[in-house]
Curated annotation (Swiss-Prot):
Chain segments carrying region Disordered: 11-49
Reported function: Phosphorylation of dTMP to form dTDP in both de novo and salvage pathways of dTTP synthesis.
Protein name: Thymidylate kinase
EC number: 2.7.4.9
Keyword Zinc-finger: no
Species: Dinoroseobacter shibae (strain DSM 16493 / NCIMB 14021 / DFL 12)
Top-rank taxon, per record: Bacteria
Entries under CDD domains matching the protein: TMPK
Database matches in InterPro entries: P-loop_NTPase (IPR027417), Thymidylate_kin-like_dom (IPR039430), Thymidylate_kin_CS (IPR018095), Thymidylate_kinase (IPR018094)
Top-rank EC class of the record's enzyme: transferase
Catalysed reactions, as listed in the record: dTMP + ATP = dTDP + ADP
């Protein structure tokens, strides 16, 4: 019987470097002979990528917090069904750039105090947590500058400004403190290679 893979998520505010660290961890696992699946949220599966464009592009006030929450949950459900669960069942590790914790922080803590509804929808439609979560922490002033400098067109959340990013950082740190069994806070305000080495060291300890 195939041993299920691990679901490993990377979380943090926009511009924190979590996407880079997710990619570097996937490369490390490939170098050690594993076959990880690197994915992202919102998105990952074709249907979820369609929803992603609705969420990350356009005017900051395009959606109400409630509508935004439903869109994120729909994207995550499709991602889980079509990509994450099949890969885990094959014994592959899945590394995802964001998962449910982002919804808890973005929609639950900063976009209308919807945390109870976030948790209810997660229980009904998703029903699982990552095995390990890396929260890449960075001063919001620096992260916001980096995020806007990308000019990717996917900057709807960055456009909410510094107070929003500051609230997000506090939300992620609170969430990590509340879930010490699976969450590891990593100082992202260092050279990329140092951050990656720290991630790998914690992964080895948790294995």
């Amino acid at each position: 019987m195939t041993q299920p893979g691990r679901l490993i998520s990377f979380e943090g505010i926009d511009g924190s470097g979590k996407s880079t660290q997710a990619r570097r961890l996937a490369e490390h696992l490939r170098d050690t002979g594993r076959d990880p699946l690197l994915t992202r949220e919102p998105g990952g599966s074709p249907g979820a990528e369609d929803i992603r464009r609705l969420l990350v592009e356009g005017d900051p006030d395009r959606w109400s917090p409630e509508t935004e929450l439903l869109l994120f949950t729909a994207a995550r459900r499709d991602h889980l069904e079509r990509l994450i669960q099949p890969a885990l069942a094959e014994g592959r590790d899945v590394i995802t750039d964001r998962f449910a914790d982002s919804t808890r922080v973005y929609q639950g803590a900063t976009r209308g105090d919807l945390r109870a509804l976030v948790d209810q929808l997660h229980s009904l439609m998703i029903g699982r947590e990552p095995d390990l979560t890396f929260v890449i922490d960075m001063p919001p002033e620096l992260a916001l500058t980096r995020g806007l400098a990308r000019a990717s067109g996917e900057d709807r959340f960055e456009e909410f400004g510094l107070p929003f990013q500051t609230a997000l950082r506090a939300g992620f740190l609170d969430l990590a403190r509340a879930n010490p069994d699976r969450c590891v806070v990593i100082d992202g305000n260092r050279p990329e290679a140092e951050v990656a080495a720290d991630v790998i060291a914690h992964l080895t300890v948790a294995a």
